[in-house]
């Protein structure tokens, strides 16, 4: 079984809804990135980039699981982008009952690195395993 690299319309609409809400809250504009880009959006104001944004939607409530994971691949992309631009990358998560965010940097500073489990609960192929960082949701700021 192969894993689809393309988001579906529901993913696209969910990301856009959250991006619009954050743009209003943070008084900025959001620039959606193309498929296969390193991040989902760039927040900017007066044509000046402010932050990269990566979105995730969970089908659980905020308190159902005490942690979130992010792949080493995503952290490498963040590290390279931050080294060049100095911009933060906010990891934005929508749970069934909350929306929150944290800087990807927190996954490096406070996270625990592990090998991912084999599971059907991710979009990856069942047997894909990689290094991940596991971060307590205590590091997320709820909106």
Feature-to-residue mapping (PLM):
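Short, conserved, surface-exposed binding loops centered on an aromatic residue
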Residues: 32-33, 42-44, 83
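Acidic-basic catalytic patches of nuclease active cores, encompassing PD-(D/E)XK
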Residues: 1-35
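Conserved catalytic cores of phosphodiester-cleaving nucleases, focusing on short active-site segments
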Residues: 41-61
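Residue-level detector of beta-strand structural context in well-folded domains
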Residues: 39-41, 90-91
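Non-catalytic C-terminal interaction segments of nucleic acid-processing enzymes
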Residues: 6, 24-26, 44, 79, ...
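Short connector loops at helix/strand junctions that flank enzyme active sites
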Residues: 36-38, 48-52, 73, 84-86
